[in-house]
Amino acid sequence: MEVRPFGLWPSPLAPGDLAAATRFRDLAWDSDGRTLVWLEGRGPQGILVCQPHGEAPRDLNTTLSVRAQVGYGGGDFAVARGHAYFVEYSGRLYRQALASGPAHPITPEFGSAASPTPSPDGRHLVYVHSDEGRDSLAVVDTEGHHWPQRLVTGADFYMQPAWHPKGDRLAWIEWDHPQMPWDGTRLMLAQLARSRDGLPCLRNKTTLAGDIDTVVAQPHFSPNGRHLVYASDQRGHSNLWLRDLASGETRCLSEDAHDVAGPAWIQGLRAFSFSADSHTLYFIRGENSQRRAHSLNLQTGTITPILALAGYSHI
């Protein structure tokens, strides 16, 4: 038997095999729940793949590489109303119909973009923008007819913008130097108005949660618009919190020694989401060094494991 030092035995895999491997990055449903879109890394390229219900999967395009580059990346694309909105490697935002046709740029080529988030009516897109060390939340119309505008400025970093279902409010996460997003962040909420050119503009900005020693993450409005759910470690672990938007009352939904939201190394992370009727929250949390899926009945507070989704890490 041949003996070789550790790490020097022959391998059937060459470096080229690893570089050419397909990597699964993220996925999203279209608004109708019948078309699934996901992002594959194929060598140096990021390719969006689309699969309508009952049909074979197909590449949306192979000429543009999908890759967001704000911070450590992530938040590469979104899907809504029959269209995919994605960040191309150059930093431009594109819109492409899921049915057919080419992709069309909707922002000019400057800076970097991430986390494109379509408005409920499909007319506007809020996204994280970074240019020459200056970060902001920007807004542009989804047809690309107007020059994009800065919507939110003042903080050093931004992530996870979220529209209220009525389109009249926006929530997001922000933080400043020297904090990292796993040290201390702020959950912000603002009313939206319309500017003269029709783009949304900000008013009545409020800090809802978080500080330099508390991490809040992943704001998510309920489909009926009554509640805002987010993760916060204000009691030691990253638990789920629910805010009643009418009364302002906030309560912890999962006060236990399990973490729901992990460190936000990248944009676009998701660990929980609502059911369509707003009555149930589905989430993934760490238990015994594993990530496990659960459902939470918001009326009874009952938490139930989802055994069929064992091993899933994001929702």
Residue ranges, per PLM feature:
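Short loop/turn segments that connect beta-strands within beta-propeller blades
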Residues: 52-55, 97-101, 141-145, 193-195, ...
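A short beta-strand motif characteristic of beta-propeller blades
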Residues: 10-18, 57-67, 102-107, 147-152, ...
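Repeat-blade elements of multi-bladed beta-propeller folds
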Residues: 74-82, 128, 273
